[in-house]
């Protein structure tokens, strides 16, 4: 039961950090490449 409480308390924290970092990354990409359909660093 203690492990379940640890999981339930850690998963929301980790997912919040992950989604916050992902949102920040997307915001920064859109700041440098606004309205881009293709990104220069993805083209080969």
Curated annotation (Swiss-Prot):
Function: May help in the organization of the PsaE and PsaF subunits.
Family listed: Belongs to the PsaJ family.
Bilayer topology: Single-pass membrane protein
Keyword Amino-acid biosynthesis: no
Keywords associated with the record: Chloroplast, Membrane, Photosynthesis, Photosystem I, Plastid, Thylakoid, Transmembrane, Transmembrane helix
Pfam family, one: PSI_PsaJ
Any one biological process term the GO annotation gives: photosynthesis
Superkingdom classification of source: Eukaryota
Disulfide bonds: none
Provenance organism: Pelargonium hortorum
Name of the protein this chain belongs to: Photosystem I reaction center subunit IX
Coiled-coil features, chain-numbered ranges: none
Keyword Protein biosynthesis tagged: no
Gene Ontology annotations for the cellular component aspect, listed alphabetically: chloroplast thylakoid membrane; photosystem I
Compartments where located: Plastid, Chloroplast thylakoid membrane
